[in-house]
Amino acid sequence: MVAMLAAGCAPARAAGPRNITLTLVRHAQSTANASGLIDTSTPGPELTPKGWCQATLAATQLAPNRYDGIYASSMIRTQETATPTAQALGEPVIVLPGLREIEAGQYEGTPEANIPQTYFAAPRRWLQGDRSARIPGSVDGNEFDARFDEAVQYIYDSGNQNPVAFSHSAAIMLWVLMNVRNPDPSLLTSKPLPNVGHVVLTGNPSEGWTLTEWDADPPPC
């Protein structure tokens, strides 16, 4: 149940700021995760059998929250992860390209074990206020933030009160820590989001967001 959306077709913005609860979920294990190599290509790798197990079990935990909108990035692994939850709730999965992973640039295909010294070198500067820092061959902090902001604005303007969006570890962690009122940058390294880990925010795009939950528990399966 994947509904593709054309760019520039966002619904009209609801009048006045209202607060919503936004849940961001990292995808389940992909074949790239299993290989230990960074893969930020689109549409990218699919889930492993273990990843499908994680997605199915995650749905049993997520579906009782009765989300009124389900979103995923343009990468296959998020759409597959969202599918069991969407089926349980009888909702379509709406694809928003802005939720995709931060492109790794020159670090594409390199070991995930080296991420703190490579892929995350520039993003750590984003969290220190230097959003002009650029991942070599990829985006800077302003470009990434604007892209993810646009996706979140679409979700907000859709009128959902309790939406869930399936995205990616770096994209979720960095956007959250760059945008909430109560950031804790140490979470990037002390509690990185595992497969099907999630965060919960309350607020709205115009007045800001508050981080209320950061679930870094080990994934099922």
Question: What does each model-found stretch correspond to?
Answer:
Residues P64-R66, I155-Q161:
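Glycine-rich phosphate-binding loop signature in dinucleotide/nucleotide-binding domains
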Residues L22, Q161-S167:
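Generic beta-sheet signal
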Residues G16-V95, N142:
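Active-site-proximal alpha-helix that buttresses catalytic centers in soluble enzyme cores
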Residues P183-T210:
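Domain-level recognition of soluble alpha/beta enzyme cores
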Residues T212-C221:
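Short, solvent-exposed aromatic-acidic interface loops
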Residues M1-A14:
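Secretory targeting and sorting signals
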Residues E46, Q87-R147, W214:
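Phosphate-handling substructures
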Residues A72-S73, A146, F166-S167:
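Short beta-strand scaffold positions
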